[in-house]
Amino acid sequence: MADQLYLSLWYPNFRLESLPAALVGVLRQFALIAKDGQANSALGRVAAASVYPIDWTESPTYQRIYVNDDRAQTSEDTEGSIIENAVAEATEQLHDDMAYEFEMRWMLWLPDVSEGGLDTVWRLEPWRVKITGFGPQFDAGSFEQNGQIRVDFGLDTPWVLEDESLDEDGAERIKHNVEKLLAFTLSVEKHCGISSRLLWTESGEPLAEKLIARLQRLN
């Protein structure tokens, strides 16, 4: 059964004033992996930003959706969706009981279930990721469990399709997805000044070990 996949990040001696810079750092590392060498890719920009007060039951006090298109000329959206600009605008008013959420996209290999025939067709599809920074009082101080910054990868389907359902081509596609996930995780650990991190699932299954074991098998 599909499970929700997260990466929680904790920082040493963290202060609320440090949150915008920490968010920019994580978003930049994600953009580097998502762009995959494409200098002007829209995948390197923020797709949406939201600010939630108190806890997740409240409506956002700020929300902006960006229209990113590499073919479009420079516009208010393309300028605003640059990581530094999007974070600066959303965090202009920093409060310790708010969460600051930024959506980005990366391309992952997914099976196309709509295709007929016996052979599975794999396609690179955009996959949404949410990167959220938490004020220390948001949701009764849930940052202690979620991290000062939490990355929500969505459902774990692109990384944990069962081996028995995969042919050689499918195994290679899943391997690519796993490598991208691990590359981002290691990049954050190396460049973002964190004190600890945890890759976890909503069900509590130890997915990190499962992913590493899968990658070793595919190699």
Report each predicted region and the residues it spans.
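Structured alpha/beta or helical-core interaction and ligand-binding surfaces enriched in interleaved
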Residues: 1-167, 199
